[in-house]
C-alpha cells in the first residue's frame, strides 16, 4: 500500500475543479470541497485503477449507492434519474456532480448528522463509495474520516485510548480470545490474562456485538469486520471506563472495570527461545516497522541468537516500502519485488544492503498472511535465504494507493499488481510454504508459545536442524 504525497493531491484538486463548469458548481448545493472529493475520486479511479474502468458502471454505482443509503436511513421514496456515460470523462464528471447535487437538494433535509458528518457529506460519501465499488474490487474503497484515522493508527504507530490487549474473535464460542496483555497496561492492572475469554462488553454480549459481521462469508473480511466492531467499543478516550465480563478456564469471573489509557502499540515483538533462537513477530507493515525490526534483531544478536523465526501469521500487510525494508534485513542483495502498473510498466525494487549476517531463518505464514507480508515471504522464499513454514498464504498480489482528502477521509484504490523476484503472480493463488504445518480450527492454543504452537515448534525444529548441519560441517 502506498500513500500519495500532498503535492500529488494538490495537483489532483486543481484538476477536479476544471472538470466541473463554473456555472454548474456555483449553483450546486455541494461545497467546493465536496466537489473536489467527488470528482477527484472519479478521476483517480478512471486514471489509476489497475484495470480499465467501465464508466457506465461507475456512474450507475454512484446512483445506486446513494439510493440505497437514503432508503437505509428512512428515506423510503428516494429516486434519482439514470445517468448515461460518454467517452468524455469531463462530461461524465459533470453528470456525476449534477446527480449528487440533485440528491443533496431533494433528500439532505430528510437526514440528520451522523458522527458529525453533515447530510450533504453523507450523500457525497455514498456516491464516492458507489463509484469505487463499481469496479468490484474488494480493496478499492472509500474511507470515512473515522475509518482513515483508524487505518493510520494501525500503520503509523499512532497512540490511541484503549485497554491494552490484543485479541481474536472466536467464532465458535462467540467470545474474544485474549492473545496478549501489555505489561503494566490497564488490563494488566485489573488482572486480565492471556487465554481469558471476554464474553460481554459494557453488558452487551460479544455474540450480539459480532452478529452484523457474521453474514460475511470471506474469512478475512469477516475477521476484519469483527475486529472493527470490537475496537470501536474497547477503544475510547483515555480516562474513560469500560466494563468487561470475563471467563477463565471455563469459569466466569467477577466483571472488571478498566480505565482506558493511552496505548502505544508496537508492530514488532521479539523474544529469545530456548537454544538461542530469536523469535520476531510482525503484526503489521507500518511506518515504524523496519526501525523496530532493526532494533529487535540487534538486541537478539547481542544475546547470542543462532537463528531466527520471523512470524508473519495473520499479518494483513501494510506499506510497500515497509515490506521492502523488512525484506532487506534478511536479503543482502538482488530483487525484492516487481510492481506493474496498468500501462504494463514494471518497477523493480532491490534490497538496500542493510541485511544482518546470514543465519538459519524460518518464516511462519498462514491463510491470513497477506499483501506486504506476502511480498516479504515471497522474496525470502525466492532468494533462498529462508524457509516458509505453515499453510498457504492469502493470495493478495495487488498494491493499493491511498489518496487522502482534505476533510480527513480518503479513497483507497488498487493501482498495480506485483510479482515475486522469480516472476510469480500470487494474486488469488497464495504462496505455498516448503514445510506444511497446520493448526486444527477447534484447537485452543496461544500463538508464539513454544509449548503449544505446532507451527512454531516446526519452525524451531527446522532452524535447529540447520544449526546442527552447520556445526557438523
Set out the residue ranges of the language-model regions:
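Bacterial N-terminal signal peptides
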Residues: 8-16
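PDZ/PDZ-like peptide-tail recognition elements
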Residues: 126, 137-180
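Cleft-lining beta-strand/loop regions that shape enzyme active-site pockets
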Residues: 26, 30-34, 46, 50, ...
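Terminal targeting/pro-maturation regions of precursor/exported proteins
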Residues: 19-141, 174-176
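Bacterial N-terminal signal peptides that target proteins for export
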Residues: 1-8
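PDZ/PDZ-like groove recognition
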Residues: 60-68, 76-83, 162-178, 182, ...
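Conserved functional hotspot residues or short segments at active or partner-binding sites
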Residues: 426-432, 436-473
Amino acid at each position: 500500500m502506498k500513500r500519495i504525497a500532498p503535492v500529488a493531491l494538490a495537483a489532483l484538486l486543481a484538476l477536479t475543479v476544471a472538470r466541473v463548469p463554473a456555472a454548474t458548481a456555483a449553483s450546486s448545493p455541494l461545497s467546493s470541497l465536496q466537489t473536489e472529493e467527488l470528482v477527484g475520486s472519479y478521476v483517480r479511479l478512471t486514471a489509476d485503477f489497475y484495470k480499465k474502468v467501465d464508466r457506465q458502471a461507475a456512474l450507475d454505482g454512484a446512483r445506486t449507492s446513494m439510493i440505497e443509503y437514503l432508503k437505509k436511513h428512512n428515506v423510503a421514496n428516494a429516486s434519482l434519474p439514470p445517468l448515461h456515460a460518454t467517452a468524455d470523462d469531463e462530461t461524465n464528471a459533470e453528470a456525476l456532480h449534477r446527480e449528487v447535487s440533485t440528491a443533496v437538494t431533494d433528500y439532505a433535509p430528510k437526514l440528520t448528522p451522523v458522527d458529525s458528518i453533515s447530510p450533504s457529506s453523507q450523500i457525497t460519501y455514498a456516491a464516492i463509495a458507489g463509484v469505487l465499488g463499481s469496479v468490484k474490487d474488494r480493496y478499492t474503497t472509500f474511507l470515512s474520516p473515522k475509518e482513515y484515522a483508524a487505518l493510520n493508527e494501525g500503520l503509523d504507530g499512532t497512540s490511541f485510548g484503549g485497554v491494552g490487549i490484543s485479541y481474536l474473535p472466536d467464532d465458535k464460542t462467540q467470545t474474544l480470545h485474549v492473545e496478549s496483555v501489555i505489561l503494566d497496561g490497564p488490563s494488566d492492572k485489573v488482572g486480565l490474562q492471556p487465554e481469558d475469554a471476554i464474553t460481554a462488553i459494557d453488558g452487551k454480549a460479544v455474540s450480539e456485538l459480532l452478529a452484523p459481521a457474521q453474514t460475511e462469508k470471506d474469512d478475512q473480511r469477516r475477521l476484519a469486520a469483527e475486529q472493527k466492531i470490537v475496537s470501536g467499543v474497547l477503544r475510547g478516550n483515555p480516562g474513560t471506563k469500560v466494563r468487561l465480563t470475563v471467563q477463565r478456564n471455563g469459569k466466569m469471573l467477577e466483571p472488571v472495570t478498566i480505565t482506558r489509557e493511552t496505548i502505544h502499540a508496537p508492530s514488532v515483538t521479539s523474544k529469545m527461545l530456548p537454544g538461542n533462537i530469536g523469535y520476531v513477530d510482525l503484526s503489521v507493515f507500518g511506518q515504524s516497522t523496519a526501525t523496530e525490526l532493526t532494533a529487535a534483531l540487534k538486541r537478539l544478536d547481542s544475546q547470542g541468537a543462532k537463528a531466527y523465526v520471523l512470524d508473519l501469521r495473520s499479518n494483513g500487510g501494510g506499506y510497500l516500502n515497509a515490506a521492502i525494508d523488512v525484506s532487506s534485513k534478511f536479503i543482502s542483495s538482488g530483487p525484492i519485488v516487481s510492481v506493474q502498473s496498468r500501462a504494463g510498466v514494471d518497477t523493480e525494487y532491490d534490497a538496500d544492503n542493510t541485511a544482518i549476517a546470514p543465519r538459519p531463518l524460518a518464516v511462519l505464514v498462514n491463510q491470513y498472511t497477506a499483501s506486504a507480508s506476502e511480498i516479504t515471504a515471497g522474496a525470502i522464499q525466492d532468494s533462498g535465504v529462508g524457509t516458509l513454514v505453515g499453510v498457504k498464504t492469502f493470495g493478495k498480489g495487488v498494491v493499493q494507493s491511498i489518496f487522502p482528502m482534505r476533510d480527513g477521509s480518503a479513497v483507497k484504490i488498487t493501482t498495480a499488481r506485483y510479482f515475486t523476484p522469480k516472476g510469480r503472480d500470487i494474486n488469488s493463488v497464495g504462496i505455498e510454504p516448503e514445510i506444511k504445518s497446520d493448526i486444527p480450527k477447534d484447537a485452543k492454543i496461544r500463538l508464539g508459545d513454544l509449548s503449544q504452537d505446532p507451527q512454531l515448534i516446526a519452525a524451531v525444529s527446522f532452524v535447529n536442524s540447520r544449526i546442527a548441519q552447520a556445526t557438523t560441517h
